[in-house]
């Protein structure tokens, strides 16, 4: 009886939590098996399929994702733990994805209440990748979960712009992962964001396949500084290739060709990530 009550309580918490606030490491009970990447039904050859995740995984899983018709993986490179830190798990994930011939994008979950400024957190990500032989061409900044941000829209906008400005100094393209609600709560729906920033928005009804929305941009509505979208996250907390992921659709950019054969990292080859998403 106690176990039944505990299970019911966990399910209630998962069903009532906002999806991006669920820690996927703790959400196995809500996982559902997803099919392979959906066929793009709008006859638009400039659209592609992707997944995003933060777990460490291996090249076999990356090969499986490739066979399941996903073209790009979004991998976390910065965690908000403490003052914020480089996510060392991304190094192996990037190398494995590169070996599998997948396109790679990197996102950061910054720590807005850190003693470090936004630009300093971006430096940690940039240097962490560069020191591991990985060149970064674009970065995505996660701006979600308003409870984790100060109740100060002006300070939050300044923090975000600090990251963007530093990234642009490095010559990186920049995108923001958010949605209309999160952006409004965190920034007061500010449009005072540095120019040429892409949008990756999320719209789901809940975790698992039953919470999916359509893998198109048809539901996008302009907000803040964002007049169009580059990526949509339409599914969260699903299992693909025995890995808990979120699923996305994106506008295709013009990247360098991905390798067709497994990479021998002992050769010292420089991996380049980013640039797979168009604006």
Swiss-Prot record:
Disruption phenotype: Reduced survival following bacterium B.thuringiensis (B-18247) infection. RNAi-mediated knockdown causes a reduction in survival following bacterium P.aeruginosa infection. Residues 47-265 form the Ch-type lysozyme domain. Expressed in intestine. GO terms for biological process: cell wall macromolecule catabolic process; defense response to Gram-negative bacterium; defense response to Gram-positive bacterium; innate immune response; peptidoglycan catabolic process; signal transduction. Keywords: Antimicrobial, Immunity, Innate immunity, Signal. Residues 1-19 form the signal peptide. GO terms for molecular function: lysozyme activity. Belongs to the glycosyl hydrolase 25 family. Involved in resistance to Gram-positive bacteria P.aeruginosa or B.thuringiensis infection. This is Lysozyme-like protein 2. The gene is lys-2.
């Amino acid at each position: 009886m106690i176990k039944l009550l505990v299970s019911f309580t966990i399910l209630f918490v998962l069903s009532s939590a906002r999806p991006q606030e669920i820690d996927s490491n703790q959400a196995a009970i809500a996982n559902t098996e997803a099919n392979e990447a959906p066929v793009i039904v709008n006859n638009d050859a400039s659209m592609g399929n992707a997944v995003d995740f933060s777990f460490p995984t291996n090249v076999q899983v990356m090969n499986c994702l490739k066979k399941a018709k996903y073209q790009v993986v979004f991998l976390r490179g910065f965690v908000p733990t403490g003052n914020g830190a480089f996510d060392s798990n991304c190094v192996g994930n990037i190398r494995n994805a590169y070996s599998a011939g997948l396109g790679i994008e990197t996102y950061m979950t910054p720590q807005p209440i850190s003693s470090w400024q936004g630009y300093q957190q971006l430096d940690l990500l940039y240097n962490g990748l560069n020191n591991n032989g990985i060149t970064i061409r674009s970065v995505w900044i996660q701006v979600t979960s308003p409870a984790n941000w100060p109740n100060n829209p002006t300070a939050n906008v300044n923090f975000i712009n600090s990251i963007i400005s530093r990234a642009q100094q490095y010559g990186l393209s920049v995108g923001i992962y958010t949605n209309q609600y999160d952006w409004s709560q965190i920034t007061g729906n500010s449009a005072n964001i540095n120019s040429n920033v892409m949008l990756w928005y999320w719209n789901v009804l809940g975790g698992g396949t039953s919470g999916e929305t359509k893998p198109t941009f048809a539901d996008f509505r302009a907000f803040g500084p964002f007049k169009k979208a580059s990526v949509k996250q339409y599914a969260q907390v699903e299992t693909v290739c025995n890995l808990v992921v979120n699923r996305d659709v994106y506008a295709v950019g013009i990247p360098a060709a991905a390798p067709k054969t497994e990479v021998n990292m002992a050769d010292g080859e420089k991996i380049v990530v980013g640039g797979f998403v168009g604006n």
